[in-house]
């Protein structure tokens, strides 16, 4: 059974463990962004292929969120890699990141002005398809939040109605866009143009076989974190199994981001769904803490202690807090596992760091198991309180009617 240990440590390395992994950025920003993009699209392809081969509809529905994010992130990374090929001055690079942020259309528009015409190996039809596709993604998901969280910072659900998404079309179009961008980057001149474009340049298409579709159910819209959390945590664990069994170590950072976002979502679920804050208060607290793991924990910690009636001699809260602080210090702003640099262009792994992949995966899952158990406990308590309040209201109404 997974459960936080007294001395759990994300950075612990068992020298006998397999696989062990060393990470160090090369110092070449353009190259690092390109390598990260390859790793992310590879992870997305492995996930989408797995869910298309399975008969488990819940996997299709839940894993959709993480794999779509991985695809989108791969495009953002390769777009920025191309831009940094032509933007070489540090301050200009910082300003570029600030201008485009996560907007794929903005990044592509700037690249279109930067890349000399002689370097563009795309045909006119391919350029038009790519621009339309990236624009469509940006119109749906401008700042890369739509498949990471169930609702915006203003508590508005991203999906207002039941939505069907064809996973095969999604994967095919994402790979088409990635290949076209790779050609612009001059990293893969050998790509054959013939039949490269298979479908219309739409981000989310619902046509095709039902067996190829993921469904975002209407019930997901009501501030429901569950499908997102399950999807991210299960996707992370699947990537871990591929690393362990097939030595696919390039999946490590995508795995870590799947887990990390799953933990952030689990903390926010407790804050929003269990702590009995009104929507505005919950929204303000999330806005203040942003992606801070420790900040979110500090908001809910006392509520958990009061509600759980933990024995005085229990060390669980202290054990969990150790995990929280370690993860927070490892990735304070939720960018270490998805970008090679921070917003000031400092490399995250400018010095060699060694990871025990099995231990890292274990620590993430031990922390998640605790947070998931807390949600179950608080949800049950809130249901009982709601029933008691309803019964008390009925008694008052009955007494009033007698008079």
Where are these regions (language model features)?
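Domain-scale activation on soluble regions of proteins
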Residues: 1-403
């Amino acid at each position: 059974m997974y459960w936080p240990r007294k001395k759990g440590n994300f950075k612990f390395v068992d020298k006998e463990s397999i696989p062990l992994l060393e990470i160090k950025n090369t110092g070449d920003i353009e190259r690092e962004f390109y390598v990260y993009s390859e790793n992310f699209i590879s992870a997305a392809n492995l996930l989408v292929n797995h869910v298309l081969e399975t008969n488990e509809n819940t996997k299709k529905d839940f894993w959709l969120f993480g794999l779509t994010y991985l695809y989108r992130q791969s495009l953002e990374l390769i777009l920025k890699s191309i831009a940094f090929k032509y933007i070489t001055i540090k301050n200009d690079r910082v300003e570029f990141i600030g201008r485009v942020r996560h907007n794929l259309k903005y990044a592509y528009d700037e690249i279109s002005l930067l890349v000399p015409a002689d370097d563009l190996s795309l045909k006119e039809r391919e350029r038009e398809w790519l621009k339309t596709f990236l624009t469509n993604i940006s119109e749906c998901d401008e700042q890369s939040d739509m498949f990471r969280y169930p609702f915006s910072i203003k508590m508005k659900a991203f999906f207002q109605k039941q939505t069907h998404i064809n996973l095969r079309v999604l994967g095919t179009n994402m790979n088409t866009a990635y290949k076209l961008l790779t050609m612009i980057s001059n990293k893969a001149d050998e790509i054959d143009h013939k039949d490269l474009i298979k479908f219309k340049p739409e981000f989310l298409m619902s046509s095709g076989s039902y067996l190829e579709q993921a469904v975002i159910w209407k019930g997901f819209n009501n501030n429901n974190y569950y499908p997102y959390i399950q999807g991210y945590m299960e996707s992370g664990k699947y990537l871990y199994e591929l690393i362990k069994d097939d030595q696919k170590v390039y999946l490590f950072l995508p795995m870590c981001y799947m887990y990390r976002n799953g933990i952030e979502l689990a903390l926010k679920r407790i804050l929003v769904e269990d702590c009995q804050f009104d929507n505005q208060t919950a929204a303000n607290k999330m806005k203040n803490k942003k992606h801070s793991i420790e900040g979110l924990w500090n908001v809910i910690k006392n509520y958990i202690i009061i509600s759980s009636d933990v024995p005085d001699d229990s060390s669980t809260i202290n054990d969990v807090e150790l995990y929280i602080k370690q993860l927070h210090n490892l990735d304070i702003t939720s960018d270490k596992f998805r970008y090679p640099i921070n917003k000031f262009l400092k490399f995250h792994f400018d010095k060699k760091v060694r990871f025990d992949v099995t231990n890292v995966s274990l620590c993430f899952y031990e922390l998640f198991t605790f947070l998931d158990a807390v949600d179950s406990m608080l949800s049950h308590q809130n249901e009982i309180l709601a029933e008691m309040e309803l019964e008390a209201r009925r008694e008052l109404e009955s007494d009033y009617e007698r008079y």
